[in-house]
C-alpha cells in the first residue's frame, strides 16, 4: 500500500514526506461538540460514518490531458493546509476519555491527497465502481479525517475529484459550502486554492448548516434540550402518533414496512449517481400543481418500487421516506434555494409505492407532503423539532446501538436535498459538470439518496450497503425511466391517463 502511495506521489511530481506547517499552529486540543463525538462513538468497521462528494470536471480548451494533475501538484508544492483540515480526533486519560480535536503540526499530504486512474476506455460504470471502493473504508483516526482523490481517465479527457470527510468534522451541507468557496464563475481565473487550503468559516466549523436530513442523532439530541416546548409537544405528538398509527402515514409515522432496505449493514459500499435537467422536473411540477421536491420523491418512489419488484420484495404498504423540512416556514429544503440556517426538522412522507401509476403516485406524494407541512405549520419550532426527533428516533438509536430496537420501525430511506451553487462554475479553468453528494448508510437504513442542484441540473447521489442494496445502477436507470413517464404525461396535455402511454406496471 505504501509503495502505491509513493508511486502516486511521484506521479504528482513531488517527493514523499510530511508537510510541516508554521510553528504558531503547534498542537492544541479544541473541544468537540457532543453531537459530533457521537459519530466517533457510533462508528465501526462495518458502519463507517463519513460523507463524500464527487465532482466531475471538464478540462479547459487549452489544457492538456494532465492539466489538473499539474494544478494539484502545484497546490501541494505551496505546502498550505488550513487549520480546520489539520484537526484529528484525540482522547486521553486527562480528558476522561472524552473526544476533542487536536490540531496537527505536521500533515502528511502524501497520504491525504492521492491520484487514481481509470483503465483505458473506462466509462461511468468504472468511475462509480472505483468511488464505491474509496467510499467504503474508514478514515484513519490517527490522522486528520479527510481524503482527496484526483481520478483521471474519464471519457472526453475529463477528470473527477472525490472528497471524503468524517461526519464528526463536517456533513454534506458543510462540504458543499466548502466546495462553493473554491469555485468561480470566471473560466479564466487561475491560481485558485484547493479544498484543504481554504479556512473553514464559522458557519462550517461550528456546523450551523442544515443537518436534519442526515443527522438523526443530532436532531434527537438537540430536541431534548428544548424544554420550553415540552408541554405543548406532548399533546401534539400524542395526536400525531395516534393519526399515524391509524392511517399508516403522516409526519410521524410508526408504520414503515420492513424491506431489504432496513436490514443491518455490512462494510462494503455501493454508490451511484445520475443527473437530469431541472427544466424537465419543473415541467412535470407545473403540470401536476406540485413542487420540484414532490417530483423528486415521486421519481424515487417509482424507482424503489421497480427495484423491489425485481427482487420480489415489494411490501403491500407504501414505503416511507424521511425528508428534511425547514421549520422556519415549513417549506421543504429546495435544492435550488438557500438553506434557512439550522431550523431543520424532518417529515415522514409516503412514497406511494403501492400505486402502479406514476401519476397517481405523484398525486399521493404531493398530498402526503402537504398534510405533513400542515401538521407542523401551527406548532412552535421546538414542538415541530420534537416531533421530527421522535420520527427519526429509530435511526438515531440504530446508529448509537448498532441495531434497531424492536418494535421501532424506521423509515425505509432518507431522501435529502442540499442547496447547491447555480450557474456555470469553474475551478482553475476546469468546468464543474456535475457534483454528487454521498452519505453514510446505517443499520436499519441501508440506502441514502442525496440530491443537489448545480448549473440548472439536479444530481442524485445514491449510497448503499452493497449486501443489502446490490446493483444500485438499477435504481439510477429507473429514476430516468420514471422522469420520462412523468414528462410524457405533461407533454400529452391535461387529463391524459398515464396507463394509455406506458401501460400498467
Curated annotation (Swiss-Prot):
At the top of the EC hierarchy, this enzyme's class is: transferase
Q: Does the keyword Secreted apply?
A: no
Which biological process terms from the Gene Ontology are attached to this UniProt entry? biological process involved in interaction with host; glycerol metabolic process; response to hypoxia; response to nitric oxide; triglyceride biosynthetic process
Enzymatic reactions: an acyl-CoA + a 1,2-diacyl-sn-glycerol = a triacyl-sn-glycerol + CoA
Q: Which GO terms describe its molecular function?
A: diacylglycerol O-acyltransferase activity; O-acyltransferase activity
Which pathway does it take part in?
Glycerolipid metabolism; triacylglycerol biosynthesis
Q: According to the record, what induces this protein's expression?
A: Induced in response to low levels of nitric oxide (NO).
EC number in record: 2.3.1.20
| Keywords, sorted A to Z | Acyltransferase, Glycerol metabolism, Lipid biosynthesis, Lipid metabolism, Transferase
List, alphabetically, the InterPro entries matched: Acyl_transf_WS/DGAT (IPR014292), CAT-like_dom_sf (IPR023213), O-acyltransferase_WSD1-like (IPR045034), O-acyltransferase_WSD1_C (IPR009721), O-acyltransferase_WSD1_N (IPR004255)
Q: List cellular component terms (GO).
A: peptidoglycan-based cell wall; plasma membrane
Residues annotated as the enzyme's active site: 167 (proton acceptor)
- Report the SS bond pairs: none
Keyword Transferase belongs to the record = yes
Give the similarity note.
Belongs to the long-chain O-acyltransferase family.
- Quote the function comment for this protein: Upon expression in E.coli functions very weakly as a triacylglycerol synthase, making triacylglycerol (TG) from diolein and long-chain fatty acyl-CoA. Has no wax synthase activity.
> NCBIfam families, from UniProt?
acyl_WS_DGAT
Name of the protein: Putative diacyglycerol O-acyltransferase Rv0895
Amino acid at each position: 500500500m505504501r509503495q502505491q502511495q509513493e508511486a502516486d506521489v511521484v506521479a504528482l511530481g513531488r517527493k514523499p514526506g510530511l508537510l510541516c506547517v508554521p510553528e504558531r499552529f503547534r498542537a492544541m486540543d479544541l473541544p468537540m461538540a457532543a453531537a459530533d463525538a457521537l459519530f466517533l462513538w457510533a462508528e465501526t468497521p462495518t458502519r463507517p460514518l463519513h460523507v463524500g462528494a464527487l465532482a466531475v470536471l471538464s478540462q479547459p480548451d487549452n489544457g492538456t490531458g494532465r492539466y489538473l494533475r499539474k494544478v494539484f501538484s502545484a497546490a501541494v508544492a505551496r505546502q498550505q493546509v488550513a487549520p480546520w483540515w489539520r484537526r484529528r480526533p484525540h482522547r486521553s486519560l486527562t480528558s476522561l476519555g472524552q473526544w476533542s480535536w487536536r490540531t496537527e503540526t505536521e500533515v502528511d499530504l502524501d497520504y491525504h491527497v492521492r491520484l487514481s486512474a481509470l483503465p483505458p476506455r473506462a466509462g461511468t460504470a468504472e468511475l462509480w465502481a472505483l468511488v464505491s471502493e474509496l467510499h467504503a473504508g474508514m478514515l484513519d483516526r490517527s490522522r486528520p479525517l479527510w481524503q482527496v482523490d484526483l481520478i483521471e481517465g474519464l471519457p472526453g479527457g475529463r477528470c473527477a475529484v472525490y472528497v471524503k470527510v468524517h461526519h464528526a468534522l463536517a456533513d454534506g451541507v458543510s462540504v458543499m459550502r466548502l466546495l462553493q468557496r473554491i469555485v468561480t464563475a470566471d473560466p479564466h481565473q487561475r491560481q485558485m486554492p484547493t479544498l484543504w487550503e481554504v479556512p473553514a468559516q464559522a458557519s462550517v466549523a461550528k456546523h450551523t448548516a442544515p443537518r436534519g436530513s442526515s443527522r438523526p442523532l443530532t436532531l434527537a439530541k438537540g430536541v431534548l434540550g428544548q424544554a420550553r416546548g415540552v408541554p405543548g409537544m406532548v399533546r401534539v405528538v400524542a395526536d400525531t402518533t395516534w393519526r399515524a398509527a391509524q392511517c399508516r402515514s403522516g409526519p410521524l409515522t410508526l408504520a414503515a414496512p420492513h424491506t431489504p432496505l432496513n436490514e443491518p449493514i455490512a462494510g462494503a459500499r455501493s454508490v451511484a449517481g445520475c443527473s437530469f435537467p431541472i427544466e424537465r422536473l419543473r415541467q412535470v411540477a407545473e403540470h401536476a400543481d406540485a413542487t420540484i421536491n414532490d417530483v423528486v420523491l415521486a421519481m424515487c418512489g417509482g424507482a424503489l418500487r421497480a427495484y423491489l419488484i425485481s427482487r420480489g420484495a415489494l411490501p403491500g404498504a407504501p414505503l416511507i421516506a424521511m425528508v428534511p423540512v425547514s421549520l422556519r416556514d415549513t417549506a421543504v429544503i429546495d435544492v435550488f434555494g438557500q438553506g434557512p440556517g439550522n431550523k431543520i426538522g424532518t417529515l415522514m412522507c409516503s412514497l406511494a409505492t403501492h400505486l402502479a401509476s406514476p401519476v397517481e403516485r405523484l398525486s399521493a406524494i404531493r398530498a402526503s407532503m402537504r398534510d405533513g407541512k400542515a401538521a407542523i405549520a401551527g406548532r412552535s419550532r421546538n414542538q415541530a423539532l420534537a416531533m421530527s426527533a421522535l420520527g427519526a428516533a429509530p435511526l438515531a438509536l440504530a446508529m448509537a446501538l448498532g441495531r434497531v430496537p424492536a418494535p421501532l420501525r424506521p423509515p425505509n430511506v432518507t431522501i435529502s436535498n442540499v442547496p447547491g451553487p447555480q450557474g456555470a462554475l469553474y475551478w482553475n479553468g476546469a468546468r464543474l459538470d456535475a457534483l454528487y453528494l454521498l452519505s453514510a448508510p446505517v443499520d436499519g437504513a441501508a440506502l441514502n439518496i442525496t440530491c443537489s442542484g448545480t448549473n440548472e441540473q439536479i444530481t442524485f447521489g445514491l449510497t448503499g450497503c452493497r449486501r443489502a442494496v446490490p446493483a444500485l445502477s438499477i435504481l439510477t436507470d429507473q429514476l430516468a425511466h420514471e422522469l420520462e413517464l412523468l414528462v410524457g404525461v405533461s407533454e400529452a396535455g391535461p387529463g391524459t391517463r398515464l396507463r394509455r402511454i406506458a401501460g400498467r406496471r
